[in-house]
Amino acid sequence: MKINGNEIRPGNVIEHQGSLWVAVKCNAVKPGKGGAFNQVELKNVIDGTKLNERFRAAETVEKVRLEQKDFTFLYQQGEALVFMDTESYEQLELQRDFVGDRAAFLQDGMTVTVELHEEKPLGISLPDQVTVTIAEADPAIKGQTVTSSYKPAILENGIRILVPPFVQAGERIIVDTNELTYIRRVSEKG
């Protein structure tokens, strides 16, 4: 699908210079002299190289339509993560570095969304929130209730985050997987 250069938004995948690029940052610039343009930071989906390009409003680029499919996480084998297509039951193997730091949040049976272009995986989305157990947390210090302070904690998957002082080791909490931040404590009632 063809779009104008000023319609490129972060997250769009475009075909440029013979390969696929994802728009990371976009900045619409309207100089006092000359025509408006869109300053776009692009990242190559194959090798990860970055490129800064200017697209005039009048020029057109090819926006690539990605297919989104749900997969279930099965297991990790070395550096490979194995997923199963929820419709065809075919297995997909991705390298751990493809998922990045968020791979630590993968749990057995978790449903993730994989973005595909011509059956080739380009991106993966985990659920926005996951429930994890705190492995270690510093004890709360008395008198710290006046200010809203947070203390460091280590989750069962090894990720370090900041939690409120009332949260203790062994408790289950909900974490935002995009920002790696504490959301709330899981209630005991279920």
Curated annotation (Swiss-Prot):
This is Elongation factor P. Belongs to the elongation factor P family. GO terms for molecular function: translation elongation factor activity. Pathway: Protein biosynthesis; polypeptide chain elongation. GO terms for cellular component: cytoplasm. It is found in: Cytoplasm. Its main location: cytoplasm. It comes from Bartonella bacilliformis (strain ATCC 35685 / KC583 / Herrer 020/F12,63). Keywords: Cytoplasm, Elongation factor, Protein biosynthesis. The lineage of its organism: Bacteria, Pseudomonadati, Pseudomonadota, Alphaproteobacteria, Hyphomicrobiales. Involved in peptide bond synthesis. Stimulates efficient translation and peptide-bond synthesis on native or reconstituted 70S ribosomes in vitro. Probably functions indirectly by altering the affinity of the ribosome for aminoacyl-tRNA, thus increasing their reactivity as acceptors for peptidyl transferase. The keyword Nucleotide-binding does not apply. GO terms for biological process: peptide biosynthetic process.
